[in-house]
Amino acid sequence: DGSITMQNPYWANYRNLRENRKDRYMLNAALSYDILDWLNVSGRIRIDNSHNTYTEKMYASSNVQLTEQSANGLYGVTKTMDRQVYGDALLNINKTFGDDWSLQANIGASFSDMKNDALKIRGPIADGTSGEKQGLANVFNIQNLSNSTKTVRKQEGWREQTQSIFASAEVGYKGTYYLTLTGRNDWPSQLAGPHSNAKSFFYPSVGLSVVLSQLIPNMPENLSYIKLRGSFASVGVAFERYIANPLYSWNESGLSWNTQ
């Protein structure tokens, strides 16, 4: 088939270069303080940052199907930054009332912030065929790229943040009967736009449980614990970004902004 071309494997290995480098660092910290023997506060924070650089270098004399038809080669570089930050603070309660009643509860708040930024340029090295000044073969620099529509220049990114408050409580009676209640309210950034009917959502749960092994006398030795539990819960999740707050999009082929 005359439409199929092949390259020397040695050339493909040493003159068609693709390199990916990623630098990443993470930080975790937590603090806890006992106010009373049944009451304490705690806080946590987690940071995860990464920087990624992806480069392409196609040398002159490479298959022009790989260089956007340029005889002088192709160059591309994409830089991406990702950042994730999470933090929370909690007030924790663990208390008994007499011999029969117990309470385990917590009240807290949290936030989650995620951000992505990307900058990309990729295109053929100018070879003079489009009426522009010829570039320097095998000089991998963005100023050396063609100004034609074959060169892609793109900057994009997104950011999402969710702020939350939550609480849970479990009341126990005689170590046998338990009532569990939880509730959480989220304010996600995806709902912050003008097309959203609500800025937050609440999702609760309720549960009842009985430790049957506390009620059954003469339990078999090989069966030491039986618990019956029933619960109801609702779950909330935000929809995709930009639905409530649409943005303009870039038309690469027409080199113009698409209006919403």
Where are the predicted features?
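Extracellular/periplasmic, surface-exposed regions of secreted and cell-surface proteins
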Residues: 2-58, 69-260
